[in-house]
């Protein structure tokens, strides 16, 4: 018998096993035990936040996954070294782009699968970024939670129902802001919004855009669908500073100035002329140009840049449509039109110049230089956050109703600045990763790395698409 061999006796029979074999058997048994536990208790992937730094520490089954996420995404161009372990971990692996049939969605019945309205998945031959009903993001069912312990905030995602965890049902959300169009629905001409390519629907009241969505049998994003995306993103990228880890969004495509005047009058022309010192860096294809009689206004109209050229001190901007302007008209730049960004697909990151293109989290443009209305969360005049108790309540209202919406007791900061402290409405039982700023005084890098804006009156809680 060789040194290191082990003798196993069973019913009086002896067998000799090499020590390496027995070690392998022990590992197999340990793996089996782990798999059995996961089958009962679920697979848990989490992060721990110290509330001082944006960077987090991984926990649970994610503990051995690197927090260096450079190759989890695309940055500027397609990443040849792309390697994201979460691509093979549920529920992240199941989040993907799809085309839907709006007509099929409108007739879904209670109990039907949300995927019954899907007509093509990303990768299918008939999937299209130019589909008549737009491009959507499917997120599969999962469970999640967050809690304080020992001075840390823990976030956890699980693939099984766990007592006390928030249940996130399978859902489909818009990839981008909606584009407004008119359709005949039930025999009537109605304005609707769909996540298609082109000019996003902006400068409309929340109630108006909500009506457009409901005209098509849809709704707007709620605090609950947003919460699902935030939780998945926090656990995957292990960092609260999403602009640093994933991409800034179109924060640099912004210009409003008293000196932002048209430099030459034109009649029914697709070309406007402006000072190069103001516009040269912003006049990129797809940038949204507002022209108006006041700074930042669009009384004349909203257009986008097709091309631009500079000669001396003047930049000539070719627009997508003809316009009549005088030298008394102002121009401003507000973000970017919706483009396909096919190289990103269902992945994360950005294609283009950081700050001048959309940034995506697993296919969804979550932030950019435009406000996004979120149903179901409101700030009251007492600065408290009020929440809709159910998805139905979130969809039924687009303004605060204190007889329906619940006071969470979370008081928002009354001043604007970088976020220092986040408030978590524990009693809601519906949110695991809410983003309510209760104290400012942080920085552009920590502990969250984002800015908090507030309003003096009761209003919807909005998500800045940054």
Language-model features and meaning:
Residues 49, 53, 223-224, 231, ...:
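C-terminal, surface-exposed recognition/capping segments
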Residues 89-93, 102-126, 149-153, 305, ...:
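Long, low-complexity, polar/charged, intrinsically disordered or flexibly structured peripheral segments
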Residues 380-391:
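A short, polar/charged loop-to-alpha-helix boundary motif
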Residues 33-183, 214-221, 234-236, 244, ...:
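Extended N-terminal export/anchoring regions of large proteins
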Residues 145-147, 180, 228, 371-372, ...:
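Eukaryotic short linear interaction motifs
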Residues 135-142, 359-362, 366-377:
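Conserved SET/PR-domain catalytic core that frames the SAM/AdoMet-binding pocket
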Residues 1-34:
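Short, low-complexity N-terminal tether/leader segments at secretion or assembly junctions of large
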Residues 126, 130-133, 156-300, 308, ...:
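Short aromatic-cysteine micro-motif
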